[in-house]
């Protein structure tokens, strides 16, 4: 069966491919190979810049030509690497052999080919390529999308900042709030967690077979290979080298990244559920698109499917992110291979997260504020001003104010404006205080 959108096992590459296409540049097999080629080429160039004695005569004018190997890397090149891998049964060695083939196409480079992948182990390439792909995926796809979501929420918060709304705690009426402020809660939370995500250090392992630069040092003991590695990883890759490692990355900093992403996802799940509830409460209507069907049986249905889709995808993303954060830092002795297959799945939570954020945005942009229903609920719930009244009575040293309001409002009888005002008139307080109390309504008792 040919692989296409209909035959793909994962919905990320099937049903939702249109939403996740940009991630292929960072997390596909093709992308991983390209990143590996990039790291190998930049490493070779850095050895030339050192220079190693055998590379001192390498023509620096050829650096752009070498960088062209990964800048112009295409699917045909990636397939060549896969063909080589069928023989080597080793993915990183296949990349090395591919680069050597590319060197053969450039006159005069034959003498330098053995300095491709010089002194390195596969994880020096993988544990730089993967964090680099994550870093660039965050910067070029994830951050812009989450910032677009925050901007949409900010727009609604500004637009509805003066709309009073009945709050619900424990599912029951509570002191009124403002719709714009409730949306600002999510703007604040997402902005703060995005800041923390951006502050996560993006680190890489680069130190030879067991993290000690054994091969480098035995061949060229005159060089400070730790300083070389620090400079290469920082200046050429924009990452930070982990100073003490086994054969593989410690993955602690990647764990921080995944945990930060999970917190952001959890906030969006909370947002999805809240707007789902607001729609259920009829505080929002949804824009209807001609031709769409909400139910195969019930023609009237207009369901909050975008928020539900988002919630489901974020649940999957969080499960994988939690596993990645817990599993990757654990490896037997100086290394086992379990991280290898796990690392190939780092794009999965990105994919589900990208699907989710686009769905949340779509759901938000369908919203139509139903002012009448919000106002109706406020008008029908005068009991919520009890807090205001008892607080002012406390200020006035009125005896047992809380208990008085509790006796009035904690019944199964509906509290109306008339009921509240009649109660106020019975209070032994000044006319000025009575007027102050009478002026309080569910519409204006919204705090600051």
Where are these regions (language model features)?
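Amphipathic alpha-helical coiled-coil segments and their boundaries
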Residues: 134-135, 142, 183, 250, ...
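Glycine-rich anion/phosphate-binding loop at the beta-strand->alpha-helix junction
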Residues: 193, 240-242, 246-332
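A helix-coil-helix interface module used to build multimeric assemblies
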Residues: 1-213, 220, 224-232, 294, ...
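Catalytic-core signal marking the mid-to-C-terminal active-site face
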Residues: 2-29, 64, 293-448
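Short, well-ordered beta-strand elements within core beta-sheets of diverse protein domains
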Residues: 181, 255-263, 388-395
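Amphipathic alpha-helices that form helix-helix packing interfaces
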Residues: 43-46, 102, 149, 153-156, ...
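Alpha-helical coiled-coil oligomerization motifs
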Residues: 158-161, 202, 276, 283, ...
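Active-site-adjacent "gating/activation" loops or surface patches in catalytic cores
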Residues: 223-247, 251
